[in-house]
Structure formats: structure tokens, C-alpha cells
Amino acid sequence: MPYILCGGHTVTTNDDGTFYINVQSPNGKKADYAAYTIGPFGTGFDQAGEYTAQRWDTSDTNRIRFRLWNTKDNRWCGRVAIFGSWVAIWNRQ
């Protein structure tokens, strides 16, 4: 069975649309898999479905970097506030 960590997260991205999730590696290695889902969205939130999160960097053992893509404008996002859920998985090897 793999090691699995997950949680909720509120963040304002950097100017280049990147943000980090801090994790505590259970085996001293970087995560083998990581994903971020934006939402849930409250009523009146008109940006639902406008952004997707791409895993951008996992070279650090205890944090994972994501970058937001703006699906409406087909470009990387700038600074934006989001809420979402994340999951990180490490293989047991």
C-alpha cells in the first residue's frame, strides 16, 4: 500500500500563477504522484471551471509546486486566490 496524504488548501498564487503545498514526506523521498483540484465553489463564484492546476515541480522532498492554467484565456495565470483539495502519494519501495 502506498503512503497517501491529502488536505484542503487556500492560497494566493505567486505572480507567475505558481503555489506550493507543504507536505511531510513519509519516506524521505519526493512524492511519486500529486494532484490538486480547485473547488468546491460557493454560490455566485463566477470563476468555476476557469482554472486547472498543473503539477509544476516535485524536486523538493517536503513540498510540491503547482501552476494554474487559465482555461478561458488559454494562458498561465497571474496572481489569483483559490481554494482546493490536494493529494500526494509515495510508493513504498
Task: Please report, for each region that a protein language model flagged, where it lies by residue.
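Extracellular attachment/recognition segments
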Residues: 1-93
